[in-house]
Amino acid sequence: MTSQPVLNAEQIMGLLPHRYPFALVDRVLEHVPGEKAVAIKNVTLNEPQFQGHFPDRPLMPGVLIVEAMAQVGGLIVTQMPDLPKGLFVFAGIDGVRFRRPVVPGDQLRISCELLSLKRQRFGKVKAEATVEGQLVCSGELMFSLVD
């Protein structure tokens, strides 16, 4: 059971540029701009990637788990006070590990925490994704502001 969202789908769309089928954050449970965010991604069988990954045994692709974590991280960096406005893009990953498969019906709980910000252009977050309290993916994600 999850708590009430602090940001709903409409509010998330106002903060992130992603749209269907690439909007991977369904609701935000905690959000402290410039510090941390906790969000939910509900994994459903009707998502387009499951048509081919894999038809007889659908698994959420690891790159989409990482992208979901990056979108939650983006909520931290893009909403920081006193930063120049612009588009923050995913710039790199370090130490990403996958611990178990994610399947339709799972609910990803994604937690991100800001580790560093350099020259008001480059951010790094620590990210973890869990399903029912079990770690499924973790790593550090980097962001860069593009003009």
UniProtKB/Swiss-Prot annotation:
Q: What is its main location?
A: cytoplasm
- InterPro entries recorded for this chain? FabA_FabZ, FabZ, HotDog_dom_sf
Tell me one GO molecular function of this protein. Answer: (3R)-hydroxyacyl-[acyl-carrier-protein] dehydratase activity
Instruction: Return the CDD domains for the record.
Output: FabZ (cd01288)
A cellular component term (GO) from this record? Answer: membrane
Q: Where would you find this protein in the cell?
A: Cytoplasm
The protein's matches in PANTHER family, at most eight in alphabetical order, are given as: 3-HYDROXYACYL-[ACYL-CARRIER-PROTEIN] DEHYDRATASE (PTHR30272:SF1)
Provide the family line. Answer: Belongs to the thioester dehydratase family. FabZ subfamily.
Q: What protein name applies here? A: 3-hydroxyacyl-[acyl-carrier-protein] dehydratase FabZ
